[in-house]
Curated annotation (Swiss-Prot):
Gene: tuf1
Protein name (record): Elongation factor Tu
Region annotated G2, chain positions: 64-68
Annotated tr-type G domain residues: 10-210
Catalysed reaction equations from the record: GTP + H2O = GDP + phosphate + H(+)
Organism: Rubrobacter xylanophilus (strain DSM 9941 / JCM 11954 / NBRC 16129 / PRD-1)
Record function comment: GTP hydrolase that promotes the GTP-dependent binding of aminoacyl-tRNA to the A-site of ribosomes during protein biosynthesis.
Gene3D superfamilies for this protein: P-loop containing nucleotide triphosphate hydrolases, Translation factors
Length: 400
């Protein structure tokens, strides 16, 4: 339950680590918490968090791969950050899609010793697809590279890769360092200094996002659990608008729309009177049983959004090189459509005269979902098949 009240004093930014497995994302996250606990000790958000704590997803233990998305908080002198440590392994790209969707900016971690790897590319592509607007690069493990020219080469490769996916590769800040050195207490240029440089880059390069505070309230449900004697809690990130205690909301999508009243709001285990766009919160819902709400639904201001099953979309189909399909697909192809926090099966109808769609194509299509999803025009989605992303799209027109 809540421990104290969440105070909003600094602008709030959502960031996260992305990059290839074992390039040091979780080590970097731990190093940031350590360095800030030392340098900005007066901010209650700053607590040193151990690597093991960040890496504590249950499946984790056997495989040494971060699976669940772990949320940390920390603050610089100017800002409060909520940080997600995104899973690095291809098997868990699905989790990354939900994690990366929460970012105002991402920290791309690349091992200077290895350079960009397949998942580096995949995560940059995903960041582009799910609309991560800014990327800052941390070239990690620089202590393992003796040749400064090699470092420059890796930096160039990363910049080119970013440009390839329409990020401004020439302008992106690149910080060189060693997260492990920083975590071990090294105060030198590659250690603590590199973490401080990275934080400065986050503060300066990632603009304070224009929050959609004035739009109607919307939260995509990520998880649901019940609290003995209090009721059902839905967690997720407020996409837009504000939510006040005791306000009425609708549960939209998958099942018939229902109304309920919000009887509690929490963020980082602290109770709040009001949540706003960008906050990751838990919401206590009156009269809703644990099995009456599920991941993939949304909580929304009454009447503000409706569920739909048929829509038109503009879609980019990943090429084989990007990890997409190797073969074309035709009308009546039935992949999964990943909206916000869940997969829904849908059938594709290509336009008149379009016989098939090749990997690497852009195309317009109509989609019929098997269950309704809360949507508006402009909503992004991923197309997935057998656990991997094969396309990305945006809803251009709602049909029914």
């Amino acid at each position: 339950m809540a421990k104290g009240v969440f105070e909003r004093t600094k602008p709030h930014i959502n960031v996260g680590t992305i990059g290839h497995v074992d390039h040091g994302k979780t080590t970097l996250t731990a190093a940031i918490t350590k360095v800030l606990a030392k340098h900005v000790p007066d901010d209650p958000a700053n607590k040193e968090v151990a690597f093991e704590q960040i890496d504590n997803a249950p499946e984790e233990r056997q495989r040494g791969i971060t699976i669940a998305t772990s949320h940390q908080e920390y603050a610089t002198k100017n800002r409060h950050y909520a940080h997600v440590d995104c899973p690095g392994h291809a098997d868990y790209v699905k989790n990354m899609i939900t994690g990366a969707a929460q970012m105002d900016g991402a920290i791309l971690v690349v091992s200077a010793a290895d350079g960009p790897m397949p998942q580096t590319r995949e995560h940059i592509l995903l960041a582009r697809q799910v609309g991560v607007p800014y990327i800052v690069v941390y070239l990690n493990k620089a202590d393992m590279v003796d040749d400064p020219e090699l470092l420059e080469l890796v930096e160039m490769e990363v910049r080119e890769l970013l440009s390839e996916y329409e990020f401004p590769g020439d302008e992106v800040p690149v910080v060189v360092g060693s997260a492990l050195k920083a975590l071990e207490g090294d105060e030198g240029e590659l250690g603590e200094q590199s973490i401080l440089k990275l934080l400065e880059a986050l503060d300066e390069y990632i603009p304070e996002p224009k929050r959609d505070i004035d739009k109607p309230f919307l939260l995509a449900v990520e998880d649901v659990f019940s609290i003995q004697g209090r009721g059902t809690v839905a967690t997720g990130r407020v996409e837009q608008g504000k939510l006040r205690l005791n306000e009425e909301v609708e549960i939209v999508g998958i099942r018939p729309t229902r109304k309920t009243v919000v009887t509690g709001i929490e963020m980082f285990n602290k109770s709040m009177q009001e949540a706003q766009a960008g906050d990751n919160i838990g919401v206590l819902l009156r009269g809703i049983k644990r099995d009456e709400i599920e991941r993939g639904q949304v909580l929304a201001a009454p009447g503000s959004i409706t569920p739909h099953t048929r829509f038109k979309a503009e879609v980019y189909v990943l090429s084989k090189e990007e990890g997409g399909r190797h073969t074309p697909f035709f009308s009546h192809y039935r992949p999964q459509f990943y909206f916000r926090t869940t997969d829904v099966t849908g059938e594709i109808f290509l336009e008149e005269g379009v016989e098939m769609v090749m990997p690497g194509d852009n195309t317009v299509m109509e989609v019929q979902l098997i269950s309704p999803i809360a949507m508006d025009e402009g909503l992004n989605f991923a197309i997935r098949e057998g656990g991997r992303t094969v396309g990305a799209g945006v809803v251009t027109q709602i049909i029914e």
